[in-house]
A protein has these predicted regions:
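Short, charged juxtamembrane terminal tails flanking transmembrane helices
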Residues: 175, 544-551
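Glycine-rich helix-loop "coupling/hinge" segments at transmembrane-helix boundaries
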Residues: 212-238, 324-328, 493-520
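Short alpha-helical segment that forms part of, or immediately flanks, the ligand-binding pocket
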Residues: 170, 452-453
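The alpha-helix within a helix-turn-helix
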Residues: 173-174, 455
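A short amphipathic helical element positioned immediately N-terminal to and/or at the very start
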Residues: 41-51, 184, 330-340
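Membrane-water interface segments at the C-terminal ends of transmembrane alpha-helices
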Residues: 2-35, 51-163, 191-212, 216, ...
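Polytopic alpha-helical membrane proteins, predominantly small-molecule transporters/carriers
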Residues: 59, 177-178
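Feature of multi-pass inner-membrane transport and sensor proteins
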Residues: 166-167, 182, 219-227, 231, ...
C-alpha cells in the first residue's frame, strides 16, 4: 500500500512539474484564446507566425549557431579528450578541473566578460592596441563564445569513454601488424563514436536553448535566436502568449529531435571493450610530444578560462570603466557594496540560495523515488515515470518558463503560485530533475541485484529496504547530484527573468540588471562570488562521486 502511495505521489509530482506545463503550451498554441477561456479559432495563431518575416531568421539563426557550436566543440573537445584519455599526462586531474570551469561559468557572464575584453576600448585594446570588436559581434563570434562554454561536454564524453574502455583492443591490433594510425582509425575511433555522438548532440542541445549569449551579443551581430524571440513575445507589449507558445513548441521540437537522434545513435550502437575484471588504464607515453600537447591544452584553457576570468576580476576591481586598467583605478568598493545592507545584493543572494536549497532537496527526493521505482521496483507505468523524469533534459529553460506561465496564469485556479517565488521553485525543479535521476540511476546499476531481495526475504518492507539498504549505498551519488542542482539553480537566468515576482531578484537577475543599468563593476563582483561558490560545490560533488565509485 505504501509503495502504491509513493508511486502515486511521484507520478502526481511529475505531472505537475513536467506534463501539465507542456500540455498548456500545446493548448495555447492550438487555441489562441485559450488564456481567456475560449476554445474557438483553433490553429488561428499558426498562419500569423508562419507569415512573420522574422521566423526564418530566428530558426535559421538558431540552427546555424547551434550547428556551429556543435562542430566547433568537436574540433576542440575531441583532440583534447583523446590526449587526456589515451596518453599519460602530468597532473591529469588539473586538466579536468580546468576544463570543468567553463561549463560551470554561467554563459551570460562569459559573454559579458568577453565583451568587456574584446570590444572597442576594451581591455585588449587598452593593453595591446588591438581590438576584435567586429569578430565578437558576429555569428562567428557568438559561436566561439558559446563554444568555449560548451566544448567540455565533448571533452569529458571522449576522455571518459577512452579511460573506461582502455586500449587493449588497439594494442591487439598493433600486435597483429596494424600501424598506430590504422589501429586508431579502425579500432579506437569506432569504439569512441557513441560517446562522441552523444557529446556533439548534447552540445547542439545546449546551444539551441542558450539565452544569455545571444541576448548579450546577438542584437549587435544581427542574430536573433528562438530563445530571444520567445522572451521578447512575453516581455514586449502587447504580450503574445500564442506566439510564445508556438515558438516554444518549435524550439522543443528541435531539442527533442536532437535528443531522439542522440538516443538512437547511442542506443543502437553497443560496444563491449571490457569483459571480466578490468585492467588499469595507464595511458601511453607521448615522449617528446608531451610538451606540445600540454601547450595546446594550456592554450585552450587560457582562452576558455583565463580571458573571461581576468576580464571578470578586472571589472570587479576597477573603480570605473572609463578609468582604464591602472593601479589608481583599483578598488574593493564593488565587493563591499555587495554586503551593504541598504542594497539589493544580499537580498538577491538570499533568495537564490534559498531557492537553490529548496530545489536540491525536492528534486533529490523526487529523483531518488523515480529512479528506485523504475529500476528496482519496476512498477507498472514505469515507462511514463522514466520519460517524465528525464524529459526536462531536452526542454530549454525558456520553454519551461512559458509552460508555467500558461499553466498558472489561469482564472479557474482558486489559488495560484503565479507571481510568487513558488514559480521559480517549480521551474528550477522541472529543469534540474534529470540530474538526480541520472546520478542515482547510475549508482543503482552498480548495486548487486540481490541486496534488496535479501532484505525482503528477511522480512523488510520495500520502504524499509530503501531506507536501510539502498539509500546508504546511493547517498554519495545522490548528494553529488543535489550539490550540482544547488550550483546550477543558484545562477539560472532565463526562467528567473521570466518568472521573478515584481520587486524580487535572484543572483542571475541582479547581475543582468546591473549590466542593464550600467553598474558593471558590482555585477561582476557578484559574478565572481557566484563562480567561486559554484566551483567549491562542484569540487565537493566530484569528490563525492569519486568516493561513490571507489565504494
Amino acid at each position: 500500500m505504501k509503495q502504491k502511495f509513493l508511486s502515486g505521489v511521484t507520478l502526481a509530482a511529475l505531472t505537475l512539474l513536467v506534463a501539465l506545463p507542456l500540455l498548456f503550451i500545446l493548448l495555447q498554441a492550438i487555441f489562441p484564446h485559450f488564456s481567456a477561456g475560449s476554445l474557438h479559432d483553433a490553429f488561428g495563431g499558426v498562419w500569423p507566425l508562419l507569415a512573420d518575416p522574422q521566423l526564418p531568421s530566428m530558426l535559421g539563426g538558431t540552427l546555424w549557431i547551434a550547428g556551429g557550436v556543435a562542430m566547433a566543440s568537436v574540433m576542440i573537445g575531441l583532440p583534447l579528450g583523446i590526449l587526456r584519455g589515451m596518453f599519460s599526462l602530468p597532473l591529469p586531474w588539473l586538466w579536468d578541473l580546468l576544463f570543468l570551469i567553463p561549463f560551470l561559468t554561467p554563459p551570460y557572464i562569459s559573454a559579458l566578460s568577453w565583451m568587456l575584453a574584446l570590444q572597442s576600448q576594451g581591455y585588449l585594446q587598452q593593453l595591446t592596441g588591438w581590438q576584435l570588436n567586429d569578430l565578437l559581434f558576429s555569428r562567428s563570434g557568438i559561436v566561439l563564445v558559446m563554444t568555449f562554454n560548451i566544448f567540455p561536454v565533448v571533452y569529458f564524453a571522449v576522455s571518459r569513454s577512452l579511460l573506461a574502455s582502455g586500449q587493449r583492443l588497439a594494442m591487439v591490433a598493433r600486435v597483429h601488424g596494424a600501424s598506430a594510425w590504422r589501429a586508431f582509425w579502425h579500432v579506437t575511433l569506432p569504439m569512441l563514436s557513441p560517446a562522441l555522438a552523444a557529446g556533439m548532440l548534447l552540445a547542439f542541445t545546449l546551444a539551441i536553448e542558450e539565452f544569455g549569449v545571444p541576448a548579450a551579443l546577438g542584437s549587435r551581430a544581427g542574430v536573433v535566436m528562438l530563445t530571444v524571440g520567445i522572451e521578447k513575445k512575453l516581455a514586449d507589449w502587447p504580450v503574445d502568449l500564442t506566439g510564445a507558445a508556438l515558438l516554444s513548441l518549435l524550439l522543443m521540437a528541435v531539442a527533442l529531435f536532437a535528443w531522439w537522434l542522440q538516443t538512437r545513435l547511442v542506443g543502437e550502437k553497443e560496444v563491449t571493450s571490457v569483459t571480466g575484471k578490468p585492467g588499469e588504464n595507464r595511458g601511453a607515453s607521448l615522449g617528446w610530444m608531451t610538451l606540445p600537447a600540454l601547450l595546446v591544452m594550456a592554450a585552450v584553457g587560457g582562452l576558455a578560462v583565463g580571458v573571461p576570468a581576468v576580464s571578470m576580476m578586472l571589472t570587479s576591481l576597477m573603480g570605473t570603466l572609463s578609468g582604464g586598467v591602472s593601479l589608481e583605478n583599483v578598488t574593493l568598493r564593488h565587493f563591499a557594496a555587495l554586503f551593504d545592507q541598504q542594497g539589493d545584493a544580499l537580498s538577491a543572494l538570499g533568495v537564490s540560495l534559498s531557492l537553490a536549497l529548496g530545489s536540491a532537496l525536492i528534486v533529490g527526493a523526487l529523483g531518488l523515488l523515480a529512479a528506485w521505482l523504475v529500476m528496482v521496483q519496476k512498477i507498472k507505468g514505469r515507462g511514463v515515470v522514466d520519460a517524465l523524469s528525464l524529459m526536462p533534459a531536452a526542454l530549454p529553460g525558456v520553454v519551461v518558463g512559458v509552460g508555467l506561465i500558461l499553466l498558472w496564469n489561469q482564472p479557474f485556479w482558486p489559488r495560484s503560485p503565479y507571481n510568487t517565488l513558488w514559480m521559480l521553485l517549480l521551474s528550477y525543479c522541472c529543469l534540474l530533475l534529470p540530474w538526480p535521476v541520472r546520478y542515482v540511476g547510475s549508482a543503482l546499476r552498480q548495486l548487486g541485484p540481490n541486496l534488496e531481495p535479501a532484505a525482503r526475504v528477511h522480512g523488510a518492507s520495500p520502504l524499509r529496504a530503501l531506507r536501510l539498504i539502498v539509500l546508504p549505498l546511493v547517498f554519495p551519488a545522490l548528494l553529488a547530484a543535489m550539490l550540482m542542482v544547488f550550483a546550477v539553480a543558484s545562477r539560472e537566468l532565463v526562467t528567473s527573468l521570466l518568472l521573478s515576482p515584481a520587486g524580487t531578484q535572484t543572483v542571475a537577475v541582479f547581475i543582468w540588471r546591473q549590466f542593464e543599468q550600467g553598474s558593471v563593476g558590482q555585477g561582476m563582483a557578484m559574478a565572481s562570488l557566484t563562480l567561486l561558490t559554484g566551483l567549491v560545490l562542484m569540487l565537493t560533488a566530484l569528490a563525492l562521486m569519486q568516493r561513490s565509485t571507489r565504494g
